[in-house]
Amino acid sequence: STLFPYTTLFRSQEQFATQRMLSEATKYSLGIVNKSLHNLKNQGYINEDNKLTDKARKDLNNKSPQNAIILAAGLGMRMVPINMQIPKALIEVKGEILIERIIKHLHETGITEIYVVVGFMKEEFEYLIDEYGVKLIVNDEYSHKNNLHSLYLAASHLKNTYIVPCDIWCEKNPFNKYELYSWYMVSDRMD
């Protein structure tokens, strides 16, 4: 997999003592770990001690996430009737409001430039501006257009960006200081 060498690169920062430990942490076979470390050395990303080189640090820093866009405009029809009085992003799960947990996770990772695309009950999100320093983008067409339109409205802010749905709950912080590839947070798997 082309993603594995970068996973190895990130994990090698965690100072794994052996390739076996790295294999267990990444869930890749020992053979793939060995081959990937060899490739990373040949490409100049790690040295003979499996430590990051200046080239690797520069690449990681250039590609680290700069901001986040949280998509929160929709009606959330799958959650009716729960969300008819409150937007789905503001529902409390395990003692925390969904969107606040996402924002806190982003802040823990150093992401403070956060845009929230709102529509349905948009006024309910205004407290986030003062409390967390987010910026709101209004999607007035939320009732008949989907998340792609919300993302279009935020397109000028895309730059090494996390794009996150507002109605997820993660036990552990899913965000990282370094990401070499864009990804959209969605899964049908339970943590």
Locate predicted features.
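The conserved acidic donor/metal-binding loop of glycosyltransferases
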Residues: 166-169
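Glycine-rich N-terminal loop/short-helix segment of MobA-like nucleotidyltransferase
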Residues: 21, 59-92
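Glycine/Thr-rich phosphate-binding loops of Rossmann-like dinucleotide-binding domains
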Residues: 78-79, 124, 171-172
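Conserved N-terminal catalytic core of the sugar/cofactor nucleotidyltransferase
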Residues: 10-67, 96-163
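Conserved core of the sugar-phosphate nucleotidyltransferase
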Residues: 46, 171-191
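Structural signal for conserved beta-strand scaffold positions within catalytic alpha/beta enzyme cores
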Residues: 92, 138, 184-187
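Short, small-residue-biased leader/transition segments that mark boundaries at the very start
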Residues: 2-9
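Short amphipathic alpha-helical segments
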Residues: 81-84, 127-130, 174-177
